[in-house]
């Protein structure tokens, strides 16, 4: 019988543990979120992060910047947050409007406050096997695999998607955990054949029900990072009902990877605060 990897339940457990840890530490970590424009999905995600902060005892401040802002406007806000000694973590809510240079904004974040793990220095440390802050979604996935005692070392892992926020850091974390990793993308030849090699399959392609049973090795662990709309419903990259008949374990959408991402952000923010302890 397939195991449903319940990210919601695992994240609840981790958040409760973090709440206790923060309370016992005597620290008061603070997270600043920066959102540019009024995209409803981005606003919803930011609200969820602030609610999680409140729950575990992390202070939070939201910086809202008009959608017509320039790159320089956003950089000025980031600079102020970098200088604010009361702020431990800075999160830039992505995507930014096209007129804003995302790479410049991310690179402007103080690396000691880069709790999203997207700064070039953070990614470089991750690739070298010495991560300070790993991006929250890939790190959350690794925590979920560990919670269910899924063996990564020696496994053949395939990551579908090569984005800098999920695909590439996911591959790095799996490699650091001694998996044999393949990254697939839009130019991969015979993609189904590559995916069928996976003991652990991570899909981050952003296409509803893209992964079908024919692409999945029987008994594989399937991690669905996708968040897509299909016929008015929220679905993942994986055809869940069909693929669960083939997989040994699978994450649902919603309730799988998403909650783990937020829990990891909270953990990274506390870690950033703890790093500054004398």
UniProtKB/Swiss-Prot annotation:
UniProt-annotated binding residues for NADP(+): 161-163, 186, 227
GO cellular component, one term: cytosol
Catalytic activity, reaction form: (6R)-5,10-methylene-5,6,7,8-tetrahydrofolate + NADP(+) = (6R)-5,10-methenyltetrahydrofolate + NADPH; (6R)-5,10-methenyltetrahydrofolate + H2O = (6R)-10-formyltetrahydrofolate + H(+)
Keywords recorded for this protein, A-Z: Amino-acid biosynthesis, Histidine biosynthesis, Hydrolase, Methionine biosynthesis, Multifunctional enzyme, NADP, One-carbon metabolism, Oxidoreductase, Purine biosynthesis
Disulfide bond annotation, renumbered to this chain: none
Pathway stated in the Swiss-Prot or TrEMBL entry: One-carbon metabolism; tetrahydrofolate interconversion
Protein family according to the UniProt entry: Belongs to the tetrahydrofolate dehydrogenase/cyclohydrolase family.
Record's protein name: Bifunctional protein FolD
